[in-house]
Amino acid sequence: MHETSLGTTLTDYLSGESIDETTYESFRQALARLLVEERGYPKDRLKAKQDICYEIDGEPFHRPIDIVVYDPDNRPVLLVMFCSGSVGSYEREASVAARLFPGGPAPLAVVTDTTSAALLDAAGGGVLAEGMNAIPRWRQLLEMAAERRAEPLTEEQRDRLVRIFHTYSGFLFGACCQDCRPTRG
């Protein structure tokens, strides 16, 4: 299953704006609602569909991340990625995405299918906790992020991680249709 338009719109929970309803948008909305209403995240610290932009052999690509959580200093501290398969299959991809995210690296990532989740130490690559209760509350998130401040990537590290990230993204190429891929340009 991939994200496609359902031909209707809905009101975005975070921005209040009318947005395109897609096959994944209800999940993204539910995740945002969970973070704000159950975990205490300030709504203005969450941004949906934030792009990771990168180049492969001089060709630009970008890939959206479902939700990015920013600390009070506007640094990314948590990337939240929805997955339509086994959460464990997406852990490495999410860790790499967190390390590549602009303004980061973000120290933490969550991968979830909305019934299960894995909280990841992006720099260390390990799973810190599993299950939906693994998603930390706001204050806990800030403490965890402060303990895991990641160093900026060197050019060589970034190049290597971009290749890894693109390889994961490349699995989307031709998997089900032409639209299911990272976007060029």
Label each region the model flagged:
Residues 1-107, 116-118, 122-185:
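A short, conserved, highly charged catalytic patch centered on acidic carboxylates
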